[in-house]
C-alpha cells in the first residue's frame, strides 16, 4: 500500500512539474511575442502599414530576437538585407547610416515597414497585393515576375499556386496565417474604418 501511495505521489509531482513547465513556457512565449510591440506600433504609424502584418513578418523572420543574423547577412527583427536598408535610409535622408544599425528594433521595424509598404504598392493592381509582396520580400522581384504570369498576373490565389520555390510558397502562407492570428490584437486606429497597408476587410 505504501509503495502504491508513493507511486501516486510521484506521478502527481511529475504532472505538476510538467504543468508548471508548460505554463512557464507559455508565459515566456507570450512575453517574447509582446516584447517588440512598441517598435512595431511606431513603425506602423509612421508608414501606415498594418501592425499585425509587421508583427507576422517579425515572427517568421526572427521570432522576435533582434540580434539574429541570416546566412545572406540579413539582420535584425525583420531580417533586412543591406540593399533594402540603405534604400530606406536614402529615402529618409539619413546620414551616416550603417547596415548594423538595423540590429536596433526601432530602426529595423521602421526600415522593414517602409519596405513592406513599397512592395504592397508595387503590386497594387492585383486583387490582393499581400501574397505578391511577401513573395517579393522572401525571394526577390525577379522571381515574382517569373511566377506572375497568366491568371497569376492579378489573381493572388493563382499566383500562390504558381510560386516556383516551395519554401517561398510556404513562407507566404505561413505569414498570412500568422497575420490573421495577430489582427484581433491590433484593432484599426481610425474610427472611420480606413484600412492600412496590407489590411484586408474583416
Describe the residue ranges of each PLM region.
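N-terminal Lys/Arg-rich, disordered targeting/topogenic segments
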Residues: 1-7
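Hydrophobic membrane-insertion alpha-helices, especially the h-region
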Residues: 9-25
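Catalytic glycan-binding domains that act on GlcNAc-containing polysaccharides
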Residues: 23-202
Amino acid at each position: 500500500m505504501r509503495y502504491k501511495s508513493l507511486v501516486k505521489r510521484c506521478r502527481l509531482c511529475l504532472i505538476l512539474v510538467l504543468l508548471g513547465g508548460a505554463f512557464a513556457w507559455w508565459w515566456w512565449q507570450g512575453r517574447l511575442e509582446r516584447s517588440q510591440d512598441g517598435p512595431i506600433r511606431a513603425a506602423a504609424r509612421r508608414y501606415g502599414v498594418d501592425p499585425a502584418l509587421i508583427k507576422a513578418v517579425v515572427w517568421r523572420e526572427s521570432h522576435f530576437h533582434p540580434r539574429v543574423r541570416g546566412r545572406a547577412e540579413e539582420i535584425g527583427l525583420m531580417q533586412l538585407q543591406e540593399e533594402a536598408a540603405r534604400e530606406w535610409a536614402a529615402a529618409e535622408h539619413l546620414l551616416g547610416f550603417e547596415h548594423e544599425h538595423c540590429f536596433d528594433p526601432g530602426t529595423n521595424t521602421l526600415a522593414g515597414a517602409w519596405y513592406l509598404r513599397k512592395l504592397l504598392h508595387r503590386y497594387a493592381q492585383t486583387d490582393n497585393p499581400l501574397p505578391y509582396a511577401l513573395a517579393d520580400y522572401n525571394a526577390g522581384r525577379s522571381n515574382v515576375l517569373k511566377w506572375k504570369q497568366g491568371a497569376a498576373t492579378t489573381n493572388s490565389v493563382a499566383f500562390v499556386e504558381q510560386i516556383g520555390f516551395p519554401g517561398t510558397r510556404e513562407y507566404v502562407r505561413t505569414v498570412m496565417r500568422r497575420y490573421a492570428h495577430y489582427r484581433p490584437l491590433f484593432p484599426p486606429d481610425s474610427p472611420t474604418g480606413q484600412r492600412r497597408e496590407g489590411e484586408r476587410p474583416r
